[in-house]
């Protein structure tokens, strides 16, 4: 998507757009160390499960590329075992940045597996480093292609469902939660990619999206992406989903995922469960769109998904452009962070994610296809799409 990206690379340099400042200021931050990548992920300067996995993989690759070019060579390149110890330490560290998003763990495990295979193959340290660099870059590069695949799968499946109900010529209204587009991935997006595909093929009537408080990924990021793409869209407060379903003809809800369990239970941005319950009440198809790497077959159901809780302060403040809008000497919109609650609240409940049970989900889409539940069953068999 021209002009919108979460990560850009050039001549070995990695930069991310600081998503905390969007949509009013576009600022790129250079990421040159593992520690900087960890901080960027944890502080949500970059977010979206696929995007943070790409950043982690690219940062490891960049770290090793610089090591191979260094003179003198760093001590961890002395032997395969010293390299293995060094890299495994970094992989373990960066994996702690956000515990719920399984894509981050999948990326670090993938690099760890390549590391182990290369060591067992008897390669020297420099050759092993080259293997890891290639794998890190591949993790990032393959994301866009699979996003387009899953977006097409999901859109075509949805159109088939409505065609079977006699609405083959109708354009669709689709609601989404949070941000799952180019800013959450390496490009195109997952659930927002499905919406984009419908728009590109002339089958979207209108996109609807929740603000997704307290970080406002919807009102800040999804709004920005849809506006950039000239996709007709409407924002709604998180508490207005039920009203929307009562008063508008919504044909589907499409959401992303940070972790999908073996039975189809899905962790996603907090507020997704609310939307799923309301969609079920109104018999609106509820679709999860995510890459295969988001499916965690080691976890049987949602009760075992670790749920990240963010600092209480993040639910008490909001950041944005001053209104009426004014610019500084450099022509940038002036922004401020303001507190919207009384100071010193005794209790703030601020989970970053909730879990939607499989029974409320109509279909799960990956780059390999679409899974639905068998008649009479409340959980999924995901073997066909992983």
From Swiss-Prot:
It catalyses: 5-(methylsulfanyl)-alpha-D-ribose 1-phosphate = 5-(methylsulfanyl)-D-ribulose 1-phosphate. GO terms for molecular function: S-methyl-5-thioribose-1-phosphate isomerase activity. The record marks 178 as: Transition state stabilizer. Its main location: cytoplasm. It is found in: Cytoplasm; Nucleus. One of its GO terms (biological process) is L-methionine salvage from methylthioadenosine. Pathway: Amino-acid biosynthesis; L-methionine biosynthesis via salvage pathway; L-methionine from S-methyl-5-thio-alpha-D-ribose 1-phosphate: step 1/6. PANTHER family: METHYLTHIORIBOSE-1-PHOSPHATE ISOMERASE. Catalyzes the interconversion of methylthioribose-1-phosphate (MTR-1-P) into methylthioribulose-1-phosphate (MTRu-1-P). This is Methylthioribose-1-phosphate isomerase.
